[in-house]
Amino acid sequence: MVSHRAARRKRASVTDLYKTCKQSGTCPPDVVPKVEGTTLADKILQWSSLGIFLGGLGIGTGSGTGGRTGYIPLGGRSNTVVDVGPTRPPVVIEPVGPTDPSIVTLIEDSSVVTSGAPRPTFTGTSGFDITSAGTTTPAVLDITPSSTSVSISTTNFTNPAFSDPSIIEVPQTGEVAGNVFVGTPTSGTHGYEEIPLQTFASSGTGEEPISSTPLPTVRRVAGPRLYSRAYQQVSVANPEFLTRPSSLITYDNPAFEPVDTTLTFDPRSDVPDSDFMDIIRLHRPALTSRRGTVRFSRLGQRATMFTRSGTQIGARVHFYHDISPIAPSPEYIELQPLVSATEDNDLFDIYADDMDPAVPVPSRSTTSFAFFKYSPTISSASSYSNVTVPLTSSWDVPVYTGPDITLPSTTSVWPIVSPTAPASTQYIGIHGTHYYLWPLYYFIPKKRKRVPYFFADGFVAA
């Protein structure tokens, strides 16, 4: 015997149960909290709303109206006010009968309205009467109506702004007025005033500066920072880098390219020098001094990677080659004498008292000086007597000549013929009757204490 289980019947809704069981007090325990909003979830929302403003979101235990502001439908828009314009007057519709004509005729009583001034009509056979007047006669227009003809009068006058006068004269004296548009006529008989010119240049001593004050220091132009972290430092030992830098990048022999300009290359995988791999550009050279050397530098650009858009990405390289050191040399160069060395017997003393006793000495008190001649081959000295110039009684100043020294000389003519006798020594003699000293020289401070002699009525013979 099979037992049949009774089918489960669905319970009524919470709202229907609450309406019937609330009054009798027989409601299930889960009905009243759901309807009255006293469940645990509703209490959590009530407690949290004390510190959190939920606004008009409609979250709570209310009646489900969306709070004070109500619900706003998603994607909706606010109400707009439509302006209604003035209404047109109704058009009277006239019915057309079957017997009425289909062609509407125009109104025959309507007149054409013409606008504009009427075209003047001239009546008469004599034509226009033209009257002329001078520059002083005012223009008079004949406005008297005439039934026979129309008279037109014209006035001729001379405008000096558009006509050149026959004789240009000096304008009259200018006047001072508050109006800036005050001018003087350019023709006619006018008076003029002669205004003398004034010299505005001030006199000076001639020592005024004629140029501006120069800068105290020389402003140095900032050069490229070759030794920064942005450049890779590569030393090139190949001397071809100075004259033919393209030979380090390409194998072919291109046409002549100047070495002092920027060189451009195509990226290659096989290059003669591995330091110049992926180089596409070499900038112009520069000479710098670095740590006591003269350095030849060039900046290069590598093209290591290419993006899809064609952008080249690569490092910047500083290639340099040290040419020569500029440090001072530790060696000392000994200077060589320009005059050949002589023996001891060829030397002489210019202050030696060696005079010829055969020559008479004048009785006047003078200072004696010896004169010698130097010769590298013949060790001999020739003395001359004192030369006394007749002087006045102002100061007793002797006049003498200095020694004549002949330096050794060589000749390229072969054979060399040595002189048999010393050449005649030329001396300087001063002849005169008197002389004078400029007294002002005694009071002017001088660096070297010497008195210049000025001889009058004399000459110098060599």
From Swiss-Prot:
Main location: virion
GO terms of molecular function: DNA binding; structural molecule activity
UniProt name for this protein: Minor capsid protein L2
Biological processes, Gene Ontology terms: microtubule-dependent intracellular transport of viral material towards nucleus; symbiont entry into host cell; viral penetration into host nucleus
Disulfide bonds: C21-C27
Cellular component per GO, a single term: viral capsid
Reported function: Minor protein of the capsid that localizes along the inner surface of the virion, within the central cavities beneath the L1 pentamers. Plays a role in capsid stabilization through interaction with the major capsid protein L1. Once the virion enters the host cell, L2 escorts the genomic DNA into the nucleus by promoting escape from the endosomal compartments and traffic through the host Golgi network.
Keyword annotations of the record: Capsid protein, Cytoplasmic inwards viral transport, Disulfide bond, DNA-binding, Host endosome, Host Golgi apparatus, Host nucleus, Host-virus interaction, Late protein, Microtubular inwards viral transport, Phosphoprotein, Viral penetration into host nucleus, Virion, Virus entry into host cell
Pfam families: Late_protein_L2
Keyword 4Fe-4S: no
Entry-linked InterPro entries: Late_L2
Post-translational modification note: Highly phosphorylated.
Cell location: Virion; Host nucleus; Host early endosome; Host Golgi apparatus
Motif Nuclear localization signal in this chain: 1-12, 443-451
Similarity comment text for this entry: Belongs to the papillomaviridae L2 protein family.
Organism: Human papillomavirus type 18
Subunit relationships: Interacts with major capsid protein L1. Interacts with E2; this interaction inhibits E2 transcriptional activity but not the DNA replication function E2. Interacts with host GADD45GIP1. Interacts with host HSPA8; this interaction is required for L2 nuclear translocation. Interacts with host importins KPNB2 and KPNB3. Forms a complex with importin alpha2-beta1 heterodimers via interaction with the importin alpha2 adapter. Interacts with host DYNLT1; this interaction is essential for virus intracellular transport during entry.
